Design a protein with these regions (language model features):
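Long, terminal "pre-/pro-" and other extracytoplasmic accessory regions
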Residues: 1-79
Length: 79
Protein backbone atom coordinates (compact mmCIF):
# COMPACT_ATOMS: atom_id res chain seq x y z
CA UNK A 1 0.00 0.00 0.00
CA UNK A 2 1.49 3.32 -1.02
CA UNK A 3 0.95 6.55 0.92
CA UNK A 4 -1.36 9.25 -0.40
CA UNK A 5 -0.05 12.30 -2.24
CA UNK A 6 -0.13 14.34 0.96
CA UNK A 7 2.21 11.95 2.78
CA UNK A 8 4.84 11.57 0.07
CA UNK A 9 7.92 13.78 -0.13
CA UNK A 10 7.73 16.08 -3.12
CA UNK A 11 10.76 16.44 -5.36
CA UNK A 12 9.45 19.65 -6.91
CA UNK A 13 8.94 21.54 -3.67
CA UNK A 14 9.40 25.08 -4.95
CA UNK A 15 8.14 27.16 -7.82
CA UNK A 16 11.73 27.70 -8.98
CA UNK A 17 12.38 23.97 -9.30
CA UNK A 18 9.16 23.52 -11.31
CA UNK A 19 10.14 26.38 -13.65
CA UNK A 20 13.60 24.89 -14.10
CA UNK A 21 12.21 21.48 -15.09
CA UNK A 22 9.67 23.08 -17.44
CA UNK A 23 12.38 25.12 -19.20
CA UNK A 24 14.47 21.96 -19.54
CA UNK A 25 11.56 20.18 -21.22
CA UNK A 26 10.95 23.04 -23.65
CA UNK A 27 14.63 23.28 -24.61
CA UNK A 28 14.70 19.56 -25.41
CA UNK A 29 11.39 19.41 -27.31
CA UNK A 30 11.58 22.67 -29.27
CA UNK A 31 15.38 23.19 -29.49
CA UNK A 32 15.17 26.66 -27.91
CA UNK A 33 17.95 28.28 -25.90
CA UNK A 34 17.01 28.60 -22.19
CA UNK A 35 17.76 32.34 -22.08
CA UNK A 36 15.09 32.95 -24.77
CA UNK A 37 12.30 31.38 -22.66
CA UNK A 38 10.12 33.55 -20.42
CA UNK A 39 7.99 32.28 -17.54
CA UNK A 40 4.45 33.62 -17.96
CA UNK A 41 2.60 31.96 -15.07
CA UNK A 42 2.84 29.13 -12.53
CA UNK A 43 0.18 27.27 -10.57
CA UNK A 44 0.24 24.38 -8.10
CA UNK A 45 -2.81 22.11 -7.93
CA UNK A 46 -3.21 20.92 -4.33
CA UNK A 47 -5.68 18.17 -5.26
CA UNK A 48 -3.54 16.40 -7.87
CA UNK A 49 -0.11 17.51 -6.67
CA UNK A 50 0.80 18.79 -10.13
CA UNK A 51 2.63 21.95 -11.15
CA UNK A 52 1.46 23.91 -14.20
CA UNK A 53 3.95 26.31 -15.77
CA UNK A 54 3.19 28.55 -18.75
CA UNK A 55 6.25 29.53 -20.79
CA UNK A 56 6.68 31.75 -23.82
CA UNK A 57 9.42 32.21 -26.43
CA UNK A 58 9.44 34.01 -29.78
CA UNK A 59 5.80 33.82 -30.93
CA UNK A 60 5.03 30.50 -29.20
CA UNK A 61 3.60 29.57 -25.81
CA UNK A 62 3.24 26.27 -23.99
CA UNK A 63 1.76 24.93 -20.77
CA UNK A 64 3.77 22.23 -19.04
CA UNK A 65 2.17 19.89 -16.48
CA UNK A 66 4.53 18.17 -14.04
CA UNK A 67 4.15 15.65 -11.23
CA UNK A 68 5.56 17.22 -8.05
CA UNK A 69 6.30 13.88 -6.35
CA UNK A 70 8.14 12.15 -9.19
CA UNK A 71 9.53 15.38 -10.69
CA UNK A 72 8.61 14.38 -14.24
CA UNK A 73 6.92 16.23 -17.07
CA UNK A 74 3.52 14.68 -17.73
CA UNK A 75 2.57 16.72 -20.79
CA UNK A 76 3.53 19.75 -22.86
CA UNK A 77 0.68 21.55 -24.63
CA UNK A 78 1.62 24.21 -27.16
CA UNK A 79 -0.96 27.01 -27.33
Amino acid sequence: MSPGIGLMKRRLETEESAISLAISGITKKFKVKPNKIECLETKYDNDSGDWYVALGWKDKKAVIRMDSVQAVILEINEI
